[in-house]
From Swiss-Prot:
<dbReference type="GO" id="GO:0009060">
    <property type="term" value="P:aerobic respiration"/>
</dbReference>
<dbReference type="InterPro" id="IPR006137">
    <property type="entry name" value="NADH_UbQ_OxRdtase-like_20kDa"/>
</dbReference>
<keyword id="KW-0793">Thylakoid</keyword>
<dbReference type="GO" id="GO:0009535">
    <property type="term" value="C:chloroplast thylakoid membrane"/>
</dbReference>
<keyword id="KW-0479">Metal-binding</keyword>
<dbReference type="Pfam" id="PF01058">
    <property type="entry name" value="Oxidored_q6"/>
</dbReference>
<dbReference type="GO" id="GO:0048038">
    <property type="term" value="F:quinone binding"/>
</dbReference>
<keyword id="KW-0521">NADP</keyword>
<dbReference type="GO" id="GO:0015990">
    <property type="term" value="P:electron transport coupled proton transport"/>
</dbReference>
<keyword id="KW-0004">4Fe-4S</keyword>
<dbReference type="GO" id="GO:0045271">
    <property type="term" value="C:respiratory chain complex I"/>
</dbReference>
<keyword id="KW-0150">Chloroplast</keyword>
<keyword id="KW-0813">Transport</keyword>
<keyword id="KW-0520">NAD</keyword>
<feature type="binding site">
    <location>
        <position position="139"/>
    </location>
    <ligand>
        <name>[4Fe-4S] cluster</name>
    </ligand>
</feature>
<feature type="binding site">
    <location>
        <position position="108"/>
    </location>
    <ligand>
        <name>[4Fe-4S] cluster</name>
    </ligand>
</feature>
<keyword id="KW-0411">Iron-sulfur</keyword>
């Protein structure tokens, strides 16, 4: 409709009123005030610390780091996650209020990185523990890449429906932390054999809660998950 047909008062009223939905208003307020819980365990977190300076100035995105998970709606995992850390990470995630989001930063967080081939204590991807919204690969990712990941998360928040988000998180709370260990042949024989890296275990599984109980009895073997 042509604005000339309206009177001056009507045009002023039209320009001063914003029509929207409660869902869009909620999304706008949440994407403009993301409060992250920083879970840095390795060198990737040093790159995130660069964002605090004036060069990148992450305050312009409304990011306010919090020390308590009950005050955060975003957890940013950066670095290697071991099985000993897994229960603590899941507990922190569960203490965050809904809706909540996760950014997995760095190769070690996403796949286990260089520790994924021969380490028995490294989690092969944090998405085995908690649902991840944005994956940020790199070793380590640059600060510009972190800003891009935050921008993608903001776009995701702006398009989502609040009821669907709550329903999805109730159905997919988190993944199990009961890792299973397999007893395999020792690789420390002095001879390099790449086939051992991909050899399937032929013995029975050892549950994680009994690992330390039987650690001395399987010290001559390698444990791989």
């Amino acid at each position: 409709m042509n604005s000339i047909e309206f009177t001056l008062l009507a045009r002023r009223t039209q320009n001063s009123v914003i029509s929207t939905t409660s869902n869009d208003l909620s999304n706008w307020s949440r994407l403009s005030s993301l409060w992250p819980l920083l879970y840095g365990t390795s060198c990737c977190f040093i790159e995130f610390a660069s964002l605090i300076g004036s060069r990148f100035d992450f305050d312009r995105y409304g990011l306010v780091p919090r020390s308590s998970p009950r005050q955060a709606d975003l957890i940013l995992t950066a670095g290697t996650v071991t099985m000993k850390m897994a229960p603590s990470l899941v507990r922190l995630y569960e203490q965050m209020p809904e809706p909540k989001y996760v950014i997995a930063m760095g190769a070690c967080t996403i796949t286990g990185g260089m520790f994924s081939t021969d380490s028995y204590s490294t989690v092969r991807g944090v998405d085995k523990l908690i649902p991840v919204d944005v994956y940020l690969p790199g070793c380590p990712p640059k600060p510009e890449a972190i800003i891009d990941a935050i921008t993608k998360l903001r776009k995701k928040i702006s398009r989502e429906i609040y009821e669907d988000r709550i329903r999805s998180q109730e159905e997919n709370r988190c993944f199990t932390t009961n890792h299973k260990f397999h007893v395999g042949p020792s690789m420390h024989t002095g001879n390099y054999d790449p086939g051992l890296l991909y050899q399937l275990p032929s013995t029975s599984e050892i549950a994680s809660e009994t690992f330390f109980k039987y650690k001395s009895s399987v010290s001559a073997h390698e444990l791989v998950n």
